[in-house]
Amino acid sequence: MTLHDLKEKHDKLKKLDGGGFFKGATYKTFGSETHRYKFNSCLTENILQSFEKSYGSTLPADYKSFLTQIGNGGSGPAYGLLPLLDWNVELEINDNSFLSTTFPHIDKWNATQDFDIDDDDYTETKEFQKWEEDYFSNRHITGSIRICHYGCAIYYFLVVTGNNAGQIWVDDRANDNGIYPAISKSTGGQLTFLEWYDEWLTESLNEFA
């Protein structure tokens, strides 16, 4: 999948959905009314190099190509792609070594619950409060950047450091579902950024088939 092919598929989807090609079907694809198939301006190589130098981490090549040739956020899965500089949206991260620290997970992860959820006051217990503090700790997502908000506090993120660098993962801790890799519905394998984006385009286009 080349960027040219990706752009052609995107333009087709934009025409079918965002362009109102079919009467009454405008912005039928989930989240598309938010981004309306528009991209933000592309980033320059100098900006990317400055970002990588600041955080001591190298962004995946396919993601960088997208940022410099297609757009810095905008049209994409769910409510669209976040701009690069919004990589830590809603996260309290002030550590420049965050992105250079290895992403800690190899497989899907979720924490066990060592408290009694049948207790009406379990959220007031020290056990729960300790569990909650650790569960939502940013240490579970070091070496990654948020790139897309799916809704319901679910975020897609791109791993940039470690064995899984280049892969898309999902942070679904807000719904007690932990952290897990995005899996292709067609191949069953884990997805790189462009594979993930292309799969979204394919699935969205199939809605109009």
Short names for language-model regions:
Residues S137-N164:
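Extended serine/threonine-enriched, polar tracts that run as long, contiguous segments within proteins
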Residues Y155-Q190:
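Segments surrounding the PLD/"HKD" phosphodiesterase catalytic module and close analogs
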Residues N177-A209:
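Long, compositionally biased interface segments
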